[in-house]
Amino acid sequence: MLASVRTPNGDVINDYLPDPKQVLDPRVAYLTVSLMQNVLHSDVTGSGTGAGVRNMGFTSPAAGKTGTSHDAWFAGFTSNLLCIVWVGNDDYTDVKIEGARAAAPIWAEFMKRAVQLPQYSDTNNFSAPEGVDFVSIDSVSNLLSDASCPASFDAAFLAGTAPTETCDHPAEHRNLLQKIFGLGKNGN
């Protein structure tokens, strides 16, 4: 991006700074970041595809996404630094390795070093804007958890959109797709 044109003395001839406009509701942006944070963690819902970066010693608050097409990708960010790693061939042939195994380790090593630099060391947790609620969700039924639920996780929702039903343990369990399409436990 061209920011400005200057004289040899540094005087500005013309500025080309963009006129920033908010195009995404901050609550929706936060929900996306929250989902991408889960990519880097292991919990009762399973292991995120990028959870290995934590095992490699990167501990700062961050979010990310792995990717595998013909190439291997990992895109991740902290509150003040974005880094995208691509591992691939220049002839569009498959690299035959996932982003979590090829690109994420490179990302983790770079970010561990980058957050040691003064300009990137002040990483902060991602904070939820007003209008985002956190609720405890049962990992089997994807409903609100209660004392009968053996495993649960906290999830972010737009205010007023969280599930209202409580998990039905120890009754019949249906996964999210079964609930969406109205199928019972046996696919009926």
Give the location of each predicted region:
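Short, low-complexity, Pro/Ser/Thr/Gly-rich segments in the mature regions of secreted, periplasmic
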Residues: 173-188
